[in-house]
């Protein structure tokens, strides 16, 4: 019995250490967002620098065509015009490949880039790489709002998919209002 308990304890410790090893800290609010260059569902390359001067909603999600990820993506899709009115671009990121993203974007009629981070470098740089069941590496469901100067303006951690886009939109409106100079007549 004690041997089973000891083996279980060791196995749990290894899983915890393994999960911790994959973890990297997310960039803090106010610091420069980590640079990236990734392909979208059409094969087009996107770099963070391409969006300098615009607000960027960079959302990480675990897996294409899963219930929560589909809900999250479709809510961003349904609010796309509100984001565009604020001059914001939406970029989704997961560790799935370009082909998986292509099928997902087509099936859900997504009007924004879904970036393939198959090498998991960007997901790790943003501190969202996590291990599911201690084995499979996926992106944690986090969202970053990046300001027009390329700094992290807000970070949502381990979000619930339902209603998340509305929360991001509210935060983005508040941030944009603070940085837009008031006009007087």
Locate predicted features.
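A short beta-strand-turn-helix
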Residues: 27, 36-55
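Structural microenvironment flanking redox-active thiols in thiol-disulfide oxidoreductases
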Residues: 65-110, 118-122
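Bacterial N-terminal signal peptides that target proteins for export
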Residues: 1-9
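Thiol-/selenol-based redox modules, centered on thioredoxin-like
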Residues: 138-185
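Short loop/turn microsegments at loop-to-beta-strand junctions
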Residues: 33-34, 55, 140-142
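Short active-site neighborhood of thiol/selenol oxidoreductases, capturing the structured segment around
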Residues: 49-70
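N-proximal helix/coil linker or "cap" segments that precede and/or mark the start of modular domains
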Residues: 14-35, 180-183
């Amino acid at each position: 019995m004690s041997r089973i308990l000891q083996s279980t304890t060791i196995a749990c410790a290894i899983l915890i250490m393994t999960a911790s090893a994959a973890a990297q800290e997310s960039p803090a609010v106010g610091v420069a967002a980590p640079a990236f260059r990734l392909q979208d569902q059409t094969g087009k390359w996107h770099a963070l620098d391409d969006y300098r001067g615009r607000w960027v909603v960079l959302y990480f999600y675990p897996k294409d065509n899963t219930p929560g990820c589909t809900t999250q993506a479709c809510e961003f899709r349904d609010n796309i015009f509100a984001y565009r009115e604020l001059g914001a671009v939406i970029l989704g990121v997961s560790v799935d490949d370009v082909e998986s993203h292509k099928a997902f974007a087509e099936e859900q009629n997504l009007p924004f880039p879904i970036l393939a981070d198959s090498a998991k470098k960007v997901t790790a740089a943003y501190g969202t790489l996590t291990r599911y069941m201690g084995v499979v590496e996926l992106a944690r469901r986090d969202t970053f709002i990046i300001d027009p100067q390329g700094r992290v303006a807000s970070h949502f951690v381990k979000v619930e998919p339902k209603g998340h886009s509305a929360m991001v939109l509210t935060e983005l409106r508040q941030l944009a209002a603070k940085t837009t100079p008031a006009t007087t007549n």
